[in-house]
Each structure stands twice: as structure tokens, then as C-alpha cells.
């Protein structure tokens, strides 16, 4: 600060800021001196600094239901990269939304009667990096479990990326739709308010990184 205690908080204003840097360094030095000359017999705080964990939870997915009915589920999926040992951009990230078509099979329908549409892709809109969304794939044919893969693997991501998709069931032979999201694995515990979920598993370089598969 100048003689009138005026300060410009701008890195390029060296005259105003270098003294602040020197002050911070001097304060640390003074504390070290106090400990050296007057700290005989003093003990450091046990378990300080506290352990902050590792990166096991650094990449995860969150879900938010936008629409649910007997025709479709519309869901926003957000992938988070919050790695911090060290913070780093990562490529190779994918996620899977698992769902069941058991209710459709009761009306002689199969996976070919389910389509997926993308309604919003933050990667494409904000960064020009379109997310790849697969067609519905079979996971367990006997149990009618399928999934859609959301693929950001070609891009380096830190922070988060959001995408909104819809799973849509065609009408059956009775001219009605019979979609039921309540038996869908990845629908578990997600509501109209975004929340982190283990039921939308996340993969790194093709290997399961976080979450639970059916």
C-alpha cells in the first residue's frame, strides 16, 4: 500500500504487491524464529495437517431427472473430475446409464424398440467437443438390462461436463407405450434435484473407476 494505505489488487502492479509478498514471507520467518527461541518443549499438533484422502472419489457422476412418464425418461448426467493429488485434466472418461426393458418384453418388444436422443451437450455447446452417445446396448439379456454409454474419452476434462439425454420407448402392438423407469438401475435414488450417484458408474480408460454396475 502507499502512504495513504491505498492498495491496488492487481498482479501487474508490482509496487503495490511486492511488499505484501515480502510481508507474508517475513511473517512465516518470524513464527519460525519464535518457535526456535521460545518453543522449547512445545509439540506439534498431532495429525496436522489432516489427511485429505486420495483421488478414489475424484471422478464421479451426478444425475437429475427432467421428465419421467410411460414413454420416456429424460435425464441430465453430469460428470465431475475433482482429482486433487494433483489436480489434473484427464481424458479417457466414460459413463454408463443402465436401464431395464423387462416391462417392454411383456409386450413383445426388445432393445430395438428403445431409442436415445441428446437434448443438450455442454461439451459441444461450450467447447466444440461433441460427446459421443451410444445406441442402447445389451448388458444382461436374461435380465433385460441394457445401457447407454456417454463417452468423453477423446477430451481432456477438469471440473465438470453436462449432458441431457432421453430414453424413448416406441409404442407396442396395442398402440400404447409401456416404459417404466422404476426398475432402471441408474434411475435409483435420483430425483428432480441433481445429486451424486453410484448407480451411474464412471470408467477411466475402459476400467470401472467409480460407481456400481448392475
Segment roles from a protein language model:
Residues 69-101:
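Short beta-strand elements of extracellular/lumenal beta-sandwich folds
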Residues 102-157, 164:
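A surface/secretory-pathway sequence property marking extracellular, secreted
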Residues 1-41:
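Aromatic (Trp/Tyr) and acidic
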Residues 39-72, 101-103, 111, 117-119:
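Low-complexity, acidic Ser/Thr/Pro/Gly-rich terminal tails and inter-domain linkers that flank the onset
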Amino acid at each position: 500500500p502507499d502512504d495513504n494505505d491505498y492498495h491496488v489488487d492487481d498482479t501487474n502492479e508490482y509496487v503495490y504487491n511486492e511488499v505484501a509478498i515480502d510481508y507474508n514471507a517475513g511473517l512465516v520467518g518470524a513464527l519460525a524464529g519464535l518457535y526456535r527461541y521460545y518453543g522449547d518443549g512445545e509439540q506439534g499438533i498431532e495429525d496436522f495437517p489432516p489427511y485429505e484422502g486420495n483421488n478414489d472419489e475424484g471422478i464421479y457422476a451426478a444425475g437429475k431427472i427432467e421428465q419421467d412418464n410411460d414413454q420416456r425418461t429424460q435425464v441430465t448426467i453430469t460428470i465431475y473430475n475433482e482429482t486433487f493429488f494433483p489436480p489434473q485434466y484427464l481424458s479417457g472418461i466414460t459413463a454408463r446409464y443402465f436401464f431395464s426393458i423387462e416391462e417392454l418384453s411383456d409386450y413383445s418388444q426388445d432393445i430395438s424398440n428403445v431409442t436415445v436422443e441428446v437434448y443438450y451437450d455442454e461439451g459441444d455447446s461450450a467447447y466444440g467437443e461433441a460427446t459421443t452417445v451410444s445406441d442402447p446396448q445389451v448388458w444382461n439379456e436374461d435380465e433385460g438390462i441394457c445401457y447407454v454409454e456417454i463417452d468423453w474419452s477423446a477430451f481432456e476434462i477438469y471440473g465438470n461436463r453436462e449432458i441431457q439425454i432421453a430414453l424413448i420407448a416406441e409404442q407396442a402392438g396395442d398402440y400404447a407405450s409401456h416404459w417404466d423407469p422404476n426398475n432402471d438401475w441408474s434411475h435409483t435414488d435420483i430425483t428432480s434435484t441433481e445429486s451424486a450417484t453410484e448407480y451411474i458408474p464412471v470408467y477411466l480408460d475402459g476400467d470401472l473407476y467409480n460407481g456400481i454396475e448392475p
